[in-house]
Amino acid sequence: MQKDDVLLRMEGICKSFPGVKALDDAQLTVRPGTVHALMGENGAGKSTLMKCLFGIYSKDAGTIWFDGKEVSFKSSRDALDNGVAMVHQELNQALKRSVMDNIWLGRYPRIKLGGAKMPFVSDKAEYDMTMEVFKDLNFEKFGININPRTIMSTMPVSRRQMVEIAKAVSFNSKIIVLDEPT
């Protein structure tokens, strides 16, 4: 992509709820390699705009262009499959499962026997993949030591938030939305 290319453009986004106009002609442009912060008072529509992008809410009006195509994600799975990940304000975790299970839930690496994937999860591959994501995020450099086999409920909220960020990164997305994750 060239410097002036746009990765995400949201134009004229409107969203209303009963008795409330949450978004009125919202605009956002994001170029590759940039970091943006949406700031405003509580109730200003920041999370609503991001939930319209991520397929949680359907917009009432407006256009979303992502990676050169007009899009309207119908679900968070649709957004993830197309390169958009989101870390939500509210943690959505399986607290009785391990860190690595939470990161790879629904995407577990499978054991291959004779070239065919079996219905068994490869614990070693899941562990190694989790450690690779942690390495990509420089967790060790920042003194963040999380054992992938740790049960989520035993960790403080700050570490559980880091797991959510690692999960978003694990999708290799082109855009990661952090909706007040820290």
Role assignments for model-derived ranges:
Residues 1-182:
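Glycine-rich phosphate-binding loops of nucleotide-dependent enzymes
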